Amino acid sequence: TGYLCGEAFHGKSVYIISRRPLRDQFAGVIIALSPQKGGAEPKIIVAPEGDIFYEPQIRERLRSVRGLDISQLSCLYEKSCGAVIFYRSPDGNKVLLVKNHNGKYWSFPKGHVEKGESEKQTALREIKEETGLDVKIYDHYRQISDYCPFGKIKKRVIFFLAETKTDQVDIQQDEIDSFVWATFPQAEKMCSYENDLRVLHAARRYIDKKDAHNGSPDSI
């Protein structure tokens, strides 16, 4: 534990999470707030500047702290993993786009990392849960998408490239509103976010290069 310095929080006690020993004073950032029972002030969790901890890591490190309620932990950094999923249909390659209940735009299947999972394990689990698809994840394709909706929670999404052998999708109805298989040119028109377009373009280039190397006749 320690204390914050600064006009807004001067002298307020905090919980500190770090991967290395710290000096008596250091520059840190608030990474989470933990509301307490009985209307008490939320506890502040801080990490050294430049270090990022996500919810599973924060919970693991704080679970043994006596007297700290982390049942309603609110993390200011979130990490998700997913994939650009494509299918080699008879009339060309198609990419799967989904629209979530709380989203207005087309994007790719993804979800939060759970404790003990690798990035690829998270992506495979989320794909299976949201779409029912079994996929093969390609090596050497890993795209990072960072964004901060409403200027609050900083979100990072790791996207892989995955191929499925079927276009039969079984959507998770409590998560997904709708889905569509689109050609890459169609998907580029449907995706609204710059990050999603960048991820999509990188996937298309990767498949083009791999197919050219393998002599595949597929065209996207």
Which ranges hold each PLM region?
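Unchanged
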Residues: G111-V199
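Charged phosphate-binding loop/patch that engages nucleotide di/tri-phosphates or the phosphate backbone
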Residues: R66-Y77, K189-I220
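Hydrophobic N-terminal alpha-helices or hydrophobic patches in metabolic proteins across all domains
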Residues: G2-L76
